[in-house]
């Protein structure tokens, strides 16, 4: 509140890392290391304090912990992460002292997406706001009022559909396509729904990089 009042800025996303095992790091060496219970409370308090802000959690947390914080308000998670230098270019060896932290959730991206679909979540790969310059006060005014959801829902479905067509396993693709059909009904703006369906069909025909960018009506 002070930052907004004094500087006109506020949090766009908040990350919730904590000390976790890594090369040469033993969490037992830290007397004030945060337990799972306290960690979950911190996530819940942040979500209540800033309900409009994206919250991020990485693969340093276990699958069980990530499942819990998704229920408490985390909105962005990673999957299939590589934490060492060049990790995405080359397979990581068993002993790699360049790792930033030990990955606790070792599932592949496809497995994470499949898991999210099973939980009824929409795995979104959207970056439309950044690419359209919908940032700063322009973004915050929409996020605080919840109006940003009118762009998020179509864009989430579009980016998910592109992922499903290009990278997903057959099981994940089947679940994802079914979820897209269901979630289309939650787009209440007829024009937005029509545009989303048009773009979804174009993606299935092999076209790429669609995003819904129309500014939201304040009515």
Language-model segments: which ranges?
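Short, contiguous strand/loop micro-motifs
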Residues: 29-30, 51-53, 98-100
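Radical SAM enzyme core and accessory elements
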Residues: 67, 72-75, 81-219
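Alpha-helix N-cap and loop-to-helix initiation/capping positions
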Residues: 30-38, 104
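Conserved C-terminal portion of the radical SAM core fold
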Residues: 1-25, 35-64, 71, 76, ...
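Short acidic, glycine/proline-rich loop/turn micro-motifs
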Residues: 25-29, 91
């Amino acid at each position: 509140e002070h930052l907004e009042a004094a500087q006109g800025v506020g949090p766009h996303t908040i990350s919730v890392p904590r000390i976790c095992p890594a090369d040469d790091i033993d969490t037992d060496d830290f007397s004030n290391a945060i337990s799972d219970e306290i960690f979950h409370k911190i996530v819940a308090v942040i979500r209540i304090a800033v309900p409009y802000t994206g919250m991020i959690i990485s693969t340093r947390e276990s699958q069980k912990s990530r499942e819990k914080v998704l229920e408490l308000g985390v909105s962005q998670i990673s999957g299939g992460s590589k934490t060492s230098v060049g990790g995405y270019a080359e397979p990581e060896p068993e002993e790699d002292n360049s790792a930033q932290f030990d990955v606790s959730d070792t599932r592949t991206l496809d497995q994470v997406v499949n898991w999210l679909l099973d939980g009824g979540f929409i795995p979104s790969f959207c970056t439309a706001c950044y690419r359209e310059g919908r940032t700063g006060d322009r973004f915050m005014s929409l996020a605080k009022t919840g109006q940003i959801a009118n762009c998020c829902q179509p864009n989430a479905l579009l980016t998910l559909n592109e992922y499903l067509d290009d990278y997903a396993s057959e099981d994940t693709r089947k679940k994802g396509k079914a979820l897209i059909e269901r979630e289309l009904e939650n787009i209440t703006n007829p024009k937005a729904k029509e545009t989303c369906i048009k773009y979804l069909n174009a993606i299935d025909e092999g076209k790429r990089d669609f995003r819904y960018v129309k500014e939201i009506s304040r009515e």
